[in-house]
């Protein structure tokens, strides 16, 4: 199984990187590219490698190219799982590894803040810019026209952000804007974003309540001892701010979100306790009123 980010372009489905097992059975981040052709029902691994590992990243399409940003640092992530493998069943060693892994400042994880572009016609990667702030992992992404929004995500393992970034491709130069925060103060990761009748939607996600305060008070292992909470909130962007405008029937995170019939379709995911869910949810907006169909 590969946890990854996908993009549809030229009638094909592209899978960029992801997390899986290597030939030795170790969990690791990949930087390869696979293409699926629905007409022939066939997969092919392309002779293309991103300049960095890709996991927890987001992907969107603009003007014929796929864009990738965010995600964990490949060396740090892979090193963590290599250390755990070396520790085996030694609980003392495992506790030490976890403490060292989580007890760092956000900037010391080197989450990807570069924007990369992938051209399907040449299968080449290019530098397309970088965030003036910081990289995130597990953000929600949605785009319309020349604008793309990156919503929340992890700022470091266990610590979310409530930030919302806007990428504006209007004109010749890409502009990065920071919008009003949402799901404050702790933020969530693995949420869902979409657009319905021109209304920007953000729903669900999971985080650790109190982690932001812990981090601001100098506790780098900010989520230590905290229980993961699963959000049911549905927020709408309206008049320059976010309004809580509805609720999901249960907290949900890490599923698939798609535009469908001018609505946001959420498929599967995870709910409280890490339990997998197999149903779907359709979120529609009309006159700033949210309708949820299960």
How does the language model describe each region?
Residues 1-294:
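Kelch-like beta-propeller repeat domains
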